[in-house]
Amino acid sequence: MAAIEFSELAKKYGKVRSVRRLTASIAEGKITGLLGPNGAGKSTSLRCLLGLAKPTSGSTKILGVAYKDLKNPLSQIGAVLDSRGFHGGLTGRQNLKVMAAAAKIPDSRVDEVLELVDLEQAANKRAKGYSLGMKQRLSLAGALLGNPKVLILDEPANGLDPIGIAWLRGFLRQLAAEGKTILVSSHQLAEMQHTVDDVIIINHGMTMAQGSIKEIIGDGTLEEAFLRLTAGSTR
């Protein structure tokens, strides 16, 4: 069974088609990169997947069901779509404790996820003083609170320096080795080539290619394959 499925997904905002006939599946226990030019429909597709936007037609499934039908969704799926969704006046630890309390997750889990993302030393600092990279780590910690089976990450490397990007690569590989399924969108093609197992390339809201990283790039690079498959796009 695929961990995540998009079936003929379409989404219109007024007369604008953000996504059209997107069909793709994501295998369990792998890191899959969702790639496409600006405006290709990546973020809208993820929002439909997470029940934050209603599809015009088609459907999405996580672990075989629509997001709204998941039982205890925080233990099934964690998501990072925006690293700015924290209370700036609270510390990193306090923000996570609020999230944990709302989901009836033990406080002890907060310290566990802070350690996982290497944010223990900044845990008692107010979130408004966090760098963008630190906010990304805090967002990852929040997504991991429920120890979910599936992670959805939209541009998780934003704001990370080269050391942070290398850390993120190893971190995601470790999570996948533990059996978690990870769907990640990113513009950092060179980094994605060294991180993901599979790739979905979309353009104009449609799937242009899907397969293993080796199948997609052949003897070339991910950037070369991406540019070939999205030729003619307006950015």
Name each model feature, range by range.
Residues 97, 101, 107-122:
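Conserved ABC ATPase "signature" region
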Residues 192-194:
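A short, surface-exposed alpha-helical micro-motif characterized by mixed small hydrophobic
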Residues 151-155:
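Catalytic Walker B motif of ABC-type/P-loop ATPase nucleotide-binding domains
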Residues 210-211:
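ABC ATPase "signature
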Residues 58-73:
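Conserved ABC transporter NBD signature motif
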